[in-house]
Amino acid sequence: MSGHPGLTTHVLDTARGKPAAGVRVQLCRVTGDTRTPVTEAVTNSDGRTDAPLIERGSLKQGTYELTFHVADYFKGFVAAADPPFLDVVTLRFTVGDTSGHYHVPLVMTPWSYSTYRGS
């Protein structure tokens, strides 16, 4: 998988049918009950972060959490509930093969979300 970054994300707002710009994303490494911050970013107009969350070669085996601050995003739209139903969405996942590319998208509406390991 030469040329691919280690860990990336993408946020899509399926209620509006477009990428979700301005979503704050935090990445932590999880060891037992301890969460160690790795990085924080905000999605751009394409719903992606400007840089990989972890570069290829720096990705380590272990458990990670991506936290998406979706309430702040949805507060900007009339169709969302007040207060928004979803506040933060936290995805916990495990990295086994550090030579691979881990793309962890969030597909969301104001009331639901899903994820998958993309390419």
UniProtKB/Swiss-Prot annotation:
Pathway(s) where this gene product acts: Purine metabolism; urate degradation; (S)-allantoin from urate: step 2/3
Substrates-to-products reaction catalysed: 5-hydroxyisourate + H2O = 5-hydroxy-2-oxo-4-ureido-2,5-dihydro-1H-imidazole-5-carboxylate + H(+)
Highest taxon of the lineage: Bacteria
This enzyme's EC code(s): 3.5.2.17
Entries under SUPFAM superfamilies matching the protein: Transthyretin (synonym: prealbumin)
Miscellaneous comment: HIU hydrolysis also occurs spontaneously, but more slowly.
GO molecular function, one term: hydroxyisourate hydrolase activity
Keyword set includes Nucleotide-binding: no
Keywords: Hydrolase, Purine metabolism
Enzyme class: hydrolase
Coiled-coil intervals, chain numbering: none
Purpose of the protein: Catalyzes the hydrolysis of 5-hydroxyisourate (HIU) to 2-oxo-4-hydroxy-4-carboxy-5-ureidoimidazoline (OHCU).
Organism: Deinococcus radiodurans (strain ATCC 13939 / DSM 20539 / JCM 16871 / CCUG 27074 / LMG 4051 / NBRC 15346 / NCIMB 9279 / VKM B-1422 / R1)
Quaternary assembly: Homotetramer.
GO biological-process terms attached to the record: purine nucleobase metabolic process; urate catabolic process
UniProt: substrate binding residues: H10, R48, Y116
Protein name, as recorded: 5-hydroxyisourate hydrolase
Family of this protein: Belongs to the transthyretin family. 5-hydroxyisourate hydrolase subfamily.
